[in-house]
UniProtKB/Swiss-Prot annotation:
Protein source organism: Histophilus somni (strain 2336) (Haemophilus somnus)
Active site, per annotation: 148
Official protein name in the record: Acetate kinase
Gene Ontology MF terms: acetate kinase activity; ATP binding; magnesium ion binding
Binding-site list for substrate: 89
Record localization: Cytoplasm
Similarity comment: Belongs to the acetokinase family.
InterPro entries listed in its UniProt record: Ac/propionate_kinase, Aliphatic_acid_kin_short-chain, Aliphatic_acid_kinase_CS, ATPase_NBD
GO CC field: cytosol
Predominant location: cytoplasm
Metabolic or biological pathway, per its Swiss-Prot or TrEMBL entry: Metabolic intermediate biosynthesis; acetyl-CoA biosynthesis; acetyl-CoA from acetate: step 1/2
Residue positions binding Mg(2+): 10, 385
Record SUPFAM superfamilies: Actin-like ATPase domain
Length: 398
């Protein structure tokens, strides 16, 4: 076992996901979630060396209390002493950050500058960085920021620009940035390994499907397009987000229906997607389990898969070379066999033929090719964003 471990922090506005990984073996020593920050029932749960635990953090507790609890109560002395660096997931790096970086005062300012593009996430990441500096002062120079947007910074101008007045981009940074970059990067590299193709030669379309969902076109190992845009609202149908829609619907909701901007934002971000279409839940498992018996479940899944297939088809065109594979990952991508089946059935024109037995088997941690022999490849690969963060952090710190 490597004696140098990486603590990984993923700070949300009201939660903190954490893990400790060996960046060499990938072994997970600790994982956990602190949630309900600032509320009366703030709490934390964890798994340490296979043993589960949970505790109340106290009314109104937040990031500081959670990290202090991790350090003082959860971590053993040996584990604490083995932490050699800290990796921070940062949602938005703007145009400035195209790769992971050691956190300096300049980087902190860059994360602040990009906060206008991720107003819920980036300020929370900054709190996490500040608290990590306090909790591990001896590791201040060994904190690394890993940006969700970085992998997509290779998109060409024709992919990232909107057809808006160019001044909005030049003066205000209004362009497409994309998200889930760490996941798209990881599974594209894993696909290259499994298919025995060099990382800088792999051509894949990666589908990260979860409560948030996005697809990326990767040509010769580099991202050339992705479905999320200026914010994570653009693109695919998601758990509660609408994805693509006619912008004039917003004018209609405001001018004709009398909805405020705040109400419209809440509708598009929190009340749409699978939740809006089913009028029941944002959980894809409901739509999958009830597909044959509930019209709302069928409606939601059909729209979800149609939108996904349309993106995949368009990305086949822009990759413009032999496509090595379609990759499914994320909670839905890795487990929802019906979603994969319906989506690939839309792509029969391109030769895709699902193997029902392989597709059904590729769930709950099982992976592999799900298409028939001698047909174009679609493959399920579980994502591991934490491992990428750990490896990048180790590479820049050790």
């Amino acid at each position: 076992m490597s004696q140098k471990l990486v603590l990984i922090l993923n700070c949300g506005s009201s939660s903190l996901k954490f893990a400790i990984l060996d960046p060499v073996s990938g072994a997970e020593k600790l994982s956990g979630l602190a949630e309900a920050f600032y509320l009366p029932d703030a709490r934390i749960k964890w798994k340490l060396n296979g043993e589960k635990g949970n505790a109340d953090l106290g009314a109104g507790a937040a990031h500081s209390e959670a990290l202090n609890f991790i350090v003082s109560t959860i971590l053993t002395e040996d584990l604490k002493n083995s932490i050699a660096a800290i990796g921070h997931r940062v949602v938005h790096g703007g145009e400035k950050y195209t790769k992971s970086v050691v956190i300096t005062d300049e980087v902190i300012q860059g994360i602040k500058d990009a906060a206008e593009f991720a107003p819920l996430h980036n300020p929370a990441h900054l709190i996490g960085i500040e608290e990590a500096f306090k909790a591990f002062p001896h590791l201040k120079d060994n904190n690394v920021a890993v940006f969700d947007t970085a992998f997509h910074q290779t998109m060409p101008e024709e992919a990232f620009l909107y057809a808006l007045p160019y001044s909005l981009y030049k003066e205000h940074g209004v362009r497409r940035y994309g998200m889930h970059g760490t996941s798209h990067y990881f599974v594209s590299r894993e696909a290259a390994k499994r298919l025995n193709i060099a990382e800088d030669k792999i051509n894949v379309i990666t589908c990260h499907l979860g409560n948030g969902a996005s697809v990326a076109a990767i040509r010769q190992g580099k991202c050339i397009d992705t479905s999320m845009g200026f914010t994570p609202l653009e693109g695919l149908v998601m758990g509660t987000r609408s994805g693509d829609l006619d912008p004039a619907i917003i004018f209609y909701m405001h001018n004709t229906l009398g909805m405020s901007v705040a109400q419209i934002e809440e509708t598009l971000v929190k009340k749409s997607g699978l939740l809006g279409l089913t009028e029941v839940t944002s959980d894809c498992r409901y739509s999958e389990d009830n597909y044959e018996k509930e019209s709302a479940a069928k409606r939601a899944l059909d729209v979800f898969c149609y939108r996904l297939a349309k993106y995949i088809g368009s990305y086949m065109a822009i990759i413009g070379e032999n496509l090595d594979a379609i990759v499914f990952t994320g909670g839905i991508g890795e487990n929802a066999a019906l979603v994969r089946q319906i989506t690939l059935n839309h792509l029969k024109l391109f030769g895709y033929k699902i193997d029902d037995e392989k597709n059904s088997a590729a769930r709950f941690g099982n992976e592999g090719v799900i298409t028939a022999d001698n047909t174009p490849i679609a493959i399920v690969i579980p994502t591991n964003e934490e491992l990428v963060i750990a490896q990048d952090t180790a590479r820049l710190s050790f």
